């Protein structure tokens, strides 16, 4: 089984698309335990989601992700890169663009009551957080449209 956590409108074929709002395959609040047995999931995909959780909520979610992921299971995460946002904010000469980017990166799109950032990550912070949950083999992914974002691919220890 493959999970797309916090899918929003970005549904992935071959994945169970989970979100707090419909349309999705499974409506579920990720602030609560995942409705799957231990070590039952082959892959977890999460794009633009983890920064929407408070520090306390993130600690619970990362624990749940590790709990349901099979040993050797893949995890792929995209999130805002706070370090990149700060550097760009300080170096950008276009005041409008500077604030538009900063507000979106730090506070998210604010399209609905769930679309607000409550957390921030750097690559090293995200890796450290996931190591606490028995995750290893970290690799940086790359997608051109996500320059300045963290794209992390890793797996749960076997």
Regions found by a protein language model. Name each.
Residues 2-85, 152-156:
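Conserved SAM-binding loop
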Residues 57-60, 64, 70, 74-157:
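S-adenosyl-L-methionine-dependent methyltransferase catalytic module, highlighting the catalytic core
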């Amino acid at each position: 089984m493959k999970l797309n956590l916090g899918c929003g409108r970005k549904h992935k074929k071959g994945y169970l698309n989970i979100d707090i709002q419909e349309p999705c395959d499974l409506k579920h609040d990720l602030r609560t335990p995942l409705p799957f047995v231990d070590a039952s999931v082959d892959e977890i995909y999460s794009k633009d989601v983890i920064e929407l959780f408070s520090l306390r909520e993130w600690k619970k979610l990362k624990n749940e992700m590790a709990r349901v992921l099979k040993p050797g299971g893949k995890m792929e995460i995209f999130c805002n890169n706070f370090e990149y946002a700060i550097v760009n904010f300080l170096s950008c000469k276009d005041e409008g663009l500077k604030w538009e980017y900063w507000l979106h990166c730090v506070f998210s799109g604010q399209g609905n009551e769930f679309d607000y950032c409550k957390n921030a990550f750097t690559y090293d912070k995200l890796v450290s957080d996931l190591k606490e949950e028995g995750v290893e083999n970290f690799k940086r992914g790359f997608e051109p449209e996500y320059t300045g974002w963290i794209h992390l691919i890793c797996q749960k220890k076997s």
